[in-house]
């Protein structure tokens, strides 16, 4: 038996393994064993004769994380070159030009969806996975990308992917962390954004903490209420200047990530107005229009918003980025 211990640990997964002549596995959670052991057994089919490993799964939240962990060990011990990617929600294991294993999600995939022909990235017709579970944000991106024939998916369609902790200290650090981590896990092109509201008189707050400005269990309503409270003694609208900021990062396997940024200037109103949008939209007065972002139609907002401007910049530089890498 070789002495090397393999370990992978993040906030949602923890695996330990050791190369062995005799195989065994231990799952600390019975439900996890029922869910994930079949994938483990399928991967054991890739072992050379006489090889095996001992696997301990302390906690698990991601099929693809387990697959990557086991394949990394097999590649090192057997000098293989197994690769993993995601396709239409399925996990594919390949070596060279050979497709060796397909792990389907629990509910399966329709034949039509699985074999649907994909467009080339260079045609800007590929599917982009948006690194968010926020349906409001996804809707905005979908409307923008639809004009370019780009289909948008979000993380709600990939329930096995782990949550990526936003531990960065800047918008770019957080966006990079999300895009590059998820691209690495899925093998897909991923677009992540980190957006927030910067209020000048508050020194740029809420900034990267915009989504949780009022606490860990923050809602749009509680965040808006806290913002109004912080500005309660600021009576001149000109002193309530603010900017919505977006940093977009596109990450893809074996490519240097693409980064674009944009700001949308305005002011913080004294009370919420409008029913469209989400987040701080009801409080954000757009420039000198007198309207809040929540009073604009989706079409109007997409043209001038921080995300609209950032996506426009992205589309201008994307072809050169794709061809250069």
Curated annotation (Swiss-Prot):
Pfam family of the protein (one): Ham1p_like
Enzyme class name: hydrolase
Catalytic reaction list: XTP + H2O = XMP + diphosphate + H(+); dITP + H2O = dIMP + diphosphate + H(+); ITP + H2O = IMP + diphosphate + H(+)
Binding site for substrate: 132-137, 195, 278-281, 301, 306-307
Quaternary structure and partners: Homodimer.
Family statement: Belongs to the HAM1 NTPase family.
UniProt-recorded name of the protein: dITP/XTP pyrophosphatase
Organism: Streptococcus mutans serotype c (strain ATCC 700610 / UA159)
Lineage of origin: Bacteria, Bacillati, Bacillota, Bacilli, Lactobacillales
């Amino acid at each position: 038996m070789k002495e090397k211990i393999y370990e992978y640990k993040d906030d949602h997964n923890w695996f330990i393994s050791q190369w062995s002549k005799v195989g065994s596995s231990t799952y600390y959670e019975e439900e996890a064993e029922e869910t994930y052991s079949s994938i483990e057994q399928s991967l054991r089919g890739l072992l050379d004769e006489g090889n095996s490993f001992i696997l301990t799964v302390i906690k698990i939240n991601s099929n693809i994380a387990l697959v990557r962990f086991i394949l990394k060990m097999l590649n090192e011990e057997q000098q293989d070159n197994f690769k993993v990617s995601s396709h239409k929600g399925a996990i594919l294991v390949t070596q060279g030009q050979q497709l060796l294993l397909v792990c389907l999600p629990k509910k399966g995939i329709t034949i039509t969806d699985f074999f649907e022909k994909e467009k080339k990235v260079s045609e800007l017709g590929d599917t982009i996975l948006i690194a968010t579970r926020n349906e409001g944000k996804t809707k905005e991106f979908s409307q923008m990308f639809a004009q370019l024939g780009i289909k948008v998916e979000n993380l709600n369609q990939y329930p096995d992917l782990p949550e990526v902790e936003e531990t960065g200290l800047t918008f770019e650090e957080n966006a990079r962390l999300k895009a590059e981590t998820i691209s690495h896990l899925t093998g897909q092109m991923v677009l992540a954004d980190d957006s927030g509201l910067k209020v000048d008189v508050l020194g740029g707050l809420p900034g990267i903490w915009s989504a949780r400005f009022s606490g860990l269990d923050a809602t749009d309503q509680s965040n808006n209420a806290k913002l109004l409270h912080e500005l309660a003694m600021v009576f001149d609208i000109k002193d309530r200047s603010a900017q919505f900021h977006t940093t977009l990062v596109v990450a893809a396997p074996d490519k240097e990530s693409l980064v674009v940024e944009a700001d949308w200037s305005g002011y913080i109103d004294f009370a919420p107005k409008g029913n469209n949008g989400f987040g701080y939209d009801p409080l954000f007065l757009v420039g000198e229009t007198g309207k809040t972002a929540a009073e604009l139609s989706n079409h109007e907002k997409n043209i001038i918003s921080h995300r609209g401007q950032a996506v426009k910049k992205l589309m201008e530089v994307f072809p050169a980025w794709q061809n250069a890498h």
